[in-house]
Design a protein with these regions (language model features):
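Detector for methionine-enriched segments
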Residues: 1, 101, 128-129
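N-terminal amphipathic, basic helical "cap/leader" segment at the start of enzyme domains
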Residues: 1-67, 73-76
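A short, mixed-charge helix-start or loop-turn motif at secondary-structure junctions
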Residues: 12-13, 82-86
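Short, intrinsically disordered, charge-balanced linker/junction segments flanking boundaries
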Residues: 20-27, 123-131
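Short, glycine/charged-enriched secondary-structure capping and boundary segments
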Residues: 58-60, 84-85, 127-129
Length: 131
């Protein structure tokens, strides 16, 4: 709710009907809000001093963090909307990154989204991220 006591439009549920099913642990681990649950993304952790230094060479916005999570979209594995050919890899990766950030916040830690980076330089610094 906002300060006026009204719900934010983005928070309102978009689900109109629910089915009652028991949720198993393995099923819960696989659930993700991605297009048809394709999960076309990968997450890399940059934590060593060397990795953090290489990452800092790709952006001016590291804010002294000691760990970085790089979320990459896998276009070849994503759902593509048939009406217009729209590939949802970037949307799905953004959803995953947002949920990771919410989980980090839930642990009492902070995070920030950094979109201003040199993508070709990042690929050069971390060739294992290719593909």
């Amino acid at each position: 709710m906002n300060s006026s006591g009204h719900a934010f439009p983005a928070v309102r549920s978009q689900t109109k009907r629910f089915r009652r099913r028991r949720c198993t642990a393995s099923w819960r681990q696989r659930l993700a809000p991605t297009a048809v649950n394709k999960q076309p993304f990968k997450v890399w952790v940059a934590q060593s001093a060397d990795a953090c230094e290489r990452l800092a060479e790709t952006t001016n916005y590291t804010f002294g963090a000691g760990i970085f999570l790089i979320v990459g979209a896998k276009e070849d594995e994503a759902w593509v909307r048939s009406y217009d050919g729209r590939n949802f890899a970037d949307v799905d990766a953004a959803i995953a990154a947002t949920h990771i950030m919410l989980a980090i916040q839930n642990e009492g830690l902070g995070s920030t989204w950094i979109g201003h980076f040199d993508a070709p330089k990042l690929k050069e610094a971390f060739p294992m991220m290719e593909g």
